[in-house]
């Protein structure tokens, strides 16, 4: 454990941020999994709705630095390609 007061404070802040980020990351991953699950069912409308729900969440987390913007773009590109490939 840190001895200096500012280091103790930083440790507390880091732990608080870690928990907050873990929660946000988990939520984002859940939205992404819902899109994959909708694609697996084969219903294009449901998959499109799930994608539309997921997209602003991923963009928001990328904007806040939780994930890199290129990773967000890669997720969206991959999922929209899978949705467009459906009949």
Swiss-Prot record:
Protein name: Small ribosomal subunit protein bS20
Keywords: Ribonucleoprotein, Ribosomal protein, RNA-binding, rRNA-binding
Region (Disordered): 1-27
Any GO MF annotation of the entry: structural constituent of ribosome
Gene Ontology CC entries for this record: cytosol; small ribosomal subunit
InterPro entries, per the entry: Ribosomal_bS20, Ribosomal_bS20_sf
Regions that span the bilayer: none
Protein family according to the UniProt entry: Belongs to the bacterial ribosomal protein bS20 family.
One GO process term, biological-process aspect: translation
PANTHER family: 30S RIBOSOMAL PROTEIN S20, SMALL RIBOSOMAL SUBUNIT PROTEIN BS20C
Pfam families given in the database record: Ribosomal_S20p
Function of the molecule: Binds directly to 16S ribosomal RNA.
Keyword Transferase annotated: no
């Amino acid at each position: 454990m840190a001895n200096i007061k500012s280091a103790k404070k930083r440790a507390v802040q880091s732990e608080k941020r870690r928990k907050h980020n873990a929660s946000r990351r988990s939520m984002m991953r859940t939205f992404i999994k819902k899109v994959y699950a909708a694609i697996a069912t084969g219903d294009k409308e449901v998959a499109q709705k799930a994608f539309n729900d997921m997209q602003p969440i991923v963009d928001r987390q990328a904007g806040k630095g939780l994930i890199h913007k290129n990773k967000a773009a890669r997720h969206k590109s991959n999922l929209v390609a899978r949705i467009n490939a459906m009949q």
